[in-house]
Amino acid sequence: MNPVDDSAAAGREHDDPAFTTLIEQHRRELHVHCYRMLGSFDDAEDAVQDAFFRAWRYRETRREGAPLRPWLYQIATNACLDVIARDKRRTSLTAAAEAGDDVARSVDEVTWLQPYPDSLLEPTAPRESEPDAMVVTKETIELAFLTVIQLLTPQQRAALILRDVLGWSAKETADVLDVSVAAVNGALQRGRATLRRHLPSRKPEWPVGVDATAAERELLRKLVQASEEPNAALFESVIREDAVFRMPPEPGVTVGRDAMIRLWIEGGFTTSMRLRCVLTRANRQPALACYNLGKDGETYEAMALDVIGIDQGMIAEIITFPPTVFERFGLPASLRNEP
């Protein structure tokens, strides 16, 4: 890791507004870090606010001249660990992880999962003048990864994120977690093993030689068409046979294309809904914002956000979130029914 060297600004930190300005520069990347730790956009917001309060309160305790960024990461990580410790949903999963009980751990128990707008990830991308700015790659933010790391113990999760995602050294990670290097290496080894068990071998989204941009555009066009017509047969043509469907915060998972389509038909998809879909992106994945025509026939009301997972040119996963997430995506609550 090449920590951002904030020591040059140390002399200004006696001026409280200057200290606030300094830590605010790290808000975006700390929010992404807390989101990875917690899997929830809302909980990440709270954790960052808590971390900034702690940083402000204990700003005099930071060693003079020490880099600010690692210190803030330590505070933010501890804030996340406190959130996990207070949440019975999370502690039940982490207790099973501590016991090595894979049977008791399942992705459908991660009911607090929330999507992250791509538009809010862009400010952390590096610029030539900021070589240490965060790069948020798909592999480190996609929902499949975020879900599985919620099954890790808190220490395993933190070690994996700091070491494998952020690229920190074992010593730097040990300093953040206030444990030995041996403890970090052990937690990382166990965390990696869990990821290998729960995440299948990563395959390309598209076959070799396929224009991925054009192929994704065509796949999404068919998905939108199938949703708006509606057309169950067209749905069937774009969804993989072993695809999965989840609806956080509801528990449970629907496995298999036939089961998914049957569930949607039983829910009135082909009879009582008239949808309009807007393309967006979440977690570096394509997403559809779905609106359903209201009883007045004049307005489409926000219904759900579908985040799409693609594997080898087919839809392998759909995770549906409630319309409460629309605002953070900059999506309107309703659309006019216009020709």
Regions found by a protein language model. Give the residues of each.
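Sigma70-family region 2
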Residues: 12, 40-41, 52-68, 82-91, ...
